[in-house]
Amino acid sequence: METSSNSSGSSSSPPSQHQQQQQQNSQLNLSSQSCFSNNSSSAADFNNYMESKLSEENNYYKNFNSNLDRGDSFKLEKESIKDTIKDNIKEDKICNDNNNSSSSSSSSSSGNNNNNIKDGRAPSPITTQQISPNKLILNTTKAITKPTPILNTQQTPTTTATTNTSTSTTNSTPSKFKKIKNSTINPTIEFISKPSLSVMFGFSPIYFVESIFIVLLIYILSNFVLKETSVYVISIFVIYFVIYFDNRYQIINKLSKSSINDSDSSSNNNNNNNNTTTTNNDSASTKGNNNNEISSPETYQKDVKSKINFYEHVNISSTNLNNVNTTSNTPITNPSNVNQPSNITTATTATTTSTNNNNNVNNSINNNNNNNNNNNNNNNNNNNNNNNNNNNNNNNNNNNNGNNNGNNNGNNNNILSKENSTNSLLNNLILNNTSVGKTHNRSSSGSDSIQPPPLPTGGSSHNIFYSAFPTHPYTDIDQSSTYRTRTFGSSSINNRKSLPPEYYNQYLNFLAHSNNNNNNNNSNTNNNNNNQSVSAPVSQLATPVYQTPGTNSVVGNLENDNENNNDSFSDINDNNSVVGNDFEQDDQILQNNGISTTTSTIVPTNDETKQELSQLENSNKVRSTVSKFIKLSTGVEEKLDWAIAQQCTLQPPRSSHSVTVYGSSLVLIGGEGITGENLVQFIDVERNLFISPKVTGGKVGPESIYNHDYCRIGNKFYLFGGYVAGKLSNKLYVLTIMDDSTVHWSSPRISGGCIPSPRYGHTFTRYGNRFLLFGGYDGEQCLNDLYILEPETMCWSTVTNIKGGQTPSERFGHTSTILGEKLIIFGGKGINNNNNNNNNNNNNNNNNNNNNNNNNNNNNKGLVELNDTHILLLNEIDSSFQWQVASFHQVSEIPSERSFHSATRVGRNIVMVGGKKDDSNGNPIALRDCWVLSYRMQWSKVSGVQFSPPRYNFGLIKNGSKLFILGGKGNNNNINNNSSSGGNNSSSSSGNSNTIITNTTNTTNNNNNNNNNNNNNNNNNNNNNNNNNNNNNNNNNNNNNNNNLSILDDIWFVNTVTLPISSSVTMINYSDIKIDKEIGKGHFSKVLKGNWKGKDVAVKKLNSNKDKAREEMIQEFKAEVELLGSLQHPNLVTCYGYSLNPMCIVMEFLPSGNLFELIHSKPSEQQQSIKLDSTLILAIAFDIARGMQHLHTRNIIHRDLKSSNLLMDKHFNIKIADLGIARETSFTQTMTTIGTVAWTAPEILRHESYNQKADVYSYAIVLYELLTGEEPYQGIPPMNAGILVASKGLRPELPDNCDPNWKKLVVWCWSEDPNKRPSFEEITNYLTKTF
């Protein structure tokens, strides 16, 4: 059975291209001659015939396999025929004209080998004479004489390498492992990955594996990585993205499963070696014998045509890309001398810019967000301006001031804003005299393939990718994971799987058709250079547009010049590079370029396209979701309802004063126009009491003082700077509170000669036992110097040991607040180093208007309000400092520019309120918005009922759980004109728009900007006149506003602690509570999280006690509930009610955890700033002492006071919990040991009688935890520690560097003799007078 390589009936030389085409067409012919045509037999007869033939084939192969010992001829025959019958469609092999004609490639079978069935007759056995030379060249020395029927496609594919001289074959008998693989492993894998199961039954084994992965990932993130973040937040993100990528995998697998696998096995077989072909059939996908079920000819023909259509576009056309019309895909005869007509556009261009610097090019930008300017440069001097207007509204209706078609002429030829970067929705790509071909064409891997032109770079810091279909606005997605974001010139193009082009074609046709419906009001923009205006149809834009939730705020380097019209790109880079990288406002870019962001109601016919479009629509919701979860993860209250103290007002009114807390009273010092006995005043807001204390040392004290700042240590207040008796001062005054009716003034002697200059508007902040002075205004210039005052030695010193960082610019009227080991400085009025004036943000050639802007923005000697945040890192170890500029998340808002606002600490957060901002004429505009800066450096705007009127130079202080605003300066008559409501960020008088929150830009006068943006309009004179009138009106309003400003006397407050729903405890039906999950469990009870009346609650469900009768248990339970219900205090956990069946107590839910977790949690790299500082330690100590004082006034002993029973709310207010074992004093004289050993008093451990002083001992142990951050008796077993405490007087060891005032209090509280321990009333007084 040997024969030569030419004995197979085929010519040794390859056939012509025409013959190859005929042979392939004969294999793919599914026309009227197919087995289901009108002239053929029925499908049932044909199936019967095929079954009989298949049984004959099986019998033949049984005999064939049994006769394998006859020689290698059968092996060669089987291997050769297996390779030859693997039918490959036309797309498996398309060679370029320059490729070697003798090269060949392998083919892979997908299971259906009946392509040669004609006229209803069974196919004749295939011999090597029937195989095209292009499909297989047999260079063997053995002949095949016996014709062989069609092989069963379930046989294992093998790998064969054929050459001109020899052929190496492998044993075709499947090994034991291959049999197991074919019979067990492959069906199992196919069953697991089969997506139809999840559709039919809602579940498949792959989802079980994913579920385990999700649970494990959430556990790792919540326990080791993101300890401070709620597990619910992590769960939502993990589940969302896992399901999202799984759905994407299902879409890609469904669309490209039948075609992509075939292309992978044959795309790399096109080599230029001499007559050498390597065939790898292991990667071919054989999925069983499909001869028993043959699809209808229409279905199969449609599938074949779709495959052919896909692989026709795999190799790029031989036509040069520079000479191709992208609309019709036809060559351009003379591209070098032809200007681009209107039907030539780039596939990804939605907002394009001019790049020809040799010509005088004027780029026009429509300020009404209705035009999309596409400037295509040619070799000629003429410029084409393509205006694509996708808005249904008339352009004349989009500007309130009547500036309808204002043009902005700039010297820069390439106008790119931050949003036109690589991460934006639109890629700015223009190639001179070049138009890109179809978006789904891919370059061939052959040696003569045409490489696409290089991409223009967008700057040194940006890697621009070719994103023809940038459906995802986020850059976290791998740029090489999909076809849509691949780079030009990639070396792995042939090996990468890709979505079929028909999917993209349907998607683009859908978008183009959708956009074309809105193309009703296209207009041309007139250039001053009389350039030709060409209107390009929207249908040619092959860039998808997605819809996002509407928003009027602009995040990034954009300015909003009008409240209802965001119409100006503000930042232009002179060297034609992208300025920034803000991905959040891609929809804003579309609006600014005239592209409609509203999706059409047209429904695509392709199911996969529908599913993908739904995925894209869902991805747009991630922006708002991320912003919401960021705010939730910070633990910041987003709503505060301010209320006015009805019966209490300041007498007299005050502004520019200082306010502090002493005990339960508020202390007011100084103020503008305040003199005499009212210079110092005590206020009790709840009881409406005003006390002017007796002043001693009055001759030393100031006659009047305002615009100063102070620091406090105990009962001493250190005041520096400001106006004293109407003059700027640099003198230091000390006010000592002797008691509630007496204060004493003194002026200490300063040692050394380094004394700060006189100033006002500075900040004076306490850090440890030192005072930090920063900034101010000395009457001539702003300052940014930094001083330190040692109160013990009264010595000033300048800070010189700053390790690095950028020092904040000179400023005054700012705020400085200690947050951990950081000094946070925000806002103020001074010199803006980043943008000295806003002319740098305007693209305008009109020098007169530039001068007008310069004059308006540089009022008050060139000083402007600021909204930057700077951080001074404080290191107590080496007393070194380092400046940093705070960076915030891109999707977050930040407060607008302001000065003379107020800020204070609330837990681990900073609350900032109010302030002022000068308008273009220098008139102050008061603000009233409220913001919170978390310890994670995340700003959050607080909603709720706002105080009124807006104000600045007021006092802000936290007393207990309440925030107070006292006095200030504002407009008390025209509230509506001066204040904003709801979500407005700032307020202004009539005619001025609200300030827009941006990250890096400063707002400018809106009317002046509109004036500048309308210089190229035919109605220029009229617009200028209108703007001048507006300016005059604004000036008049502002002057009136300035005249109406007055000193205020009102007091506003807000409670930061959740108030109880009702004043008394009521019985609650257990069915009314929606139980969520179990959050804790103990020996006597378990705690469940639930919801009652729309409020999160904690349900403490008691376990049944078999030793007690039910009636006895109910009586004790009711007594405990009544006791808890009567204890309404801000520092005690609120009890809402109870239920008898089952027995449970409903209490408020506190999700922030307990004090033990806060102190002893191991800080990660991201949590270094969470360290407890002296301010927070003092606040926590005060809260515990106040809560326990309230318990003891009711003759109640807690008996289990420890850090794990001290819960915290969102503002880190302490709530004393676990009062279940608390008893009245008369019932606890002889009870046995209760509580935790480390926090239990020694008299209880000795089983002696005890009283309220046992809780004082526990309080001392909690203070030890706060001061040291360590657990008590660490390393000693609890039982041994209890014995040593009870018998040997063991106590935890305080470190040597502990503050002596704190050490004194701790030692006092854990005295061995209970009678020597202080009461909680004495503790609160000690804290007030000492710290």
From Swiss-Prot:
Gene Ontology cellular-component terms listed = cytoplasm; membrane
Question: What molecular function terms (GO) are annotated for this protein?
Answer: ATP binding; protein kinase activity; protein serine kinase activity; protein serine/threonine kinase activity
Task: Kindly state a single biological-process term from the GO annotations of this entry.
Answer: signal transduction
Record's catalysed reaction(s)? L-seryl-[protein] + ATP = O-phospho-L-seryl-[protein] + ADP + H(+); L-threonyl-[protein] + ATP = O-phospho-L-threonyl-[protein] + ADP + H(+)
Q: Where is the active site?
A: D1200 (proton acceptor)
Q: Which PANTHER family match?
A: SERINE/THREONINE-PROTEIN KINASE TNNI3K-RELATED
Protein name per its UniProtKB record: Probable serine/threonine-protein kinase DDB_G0272254
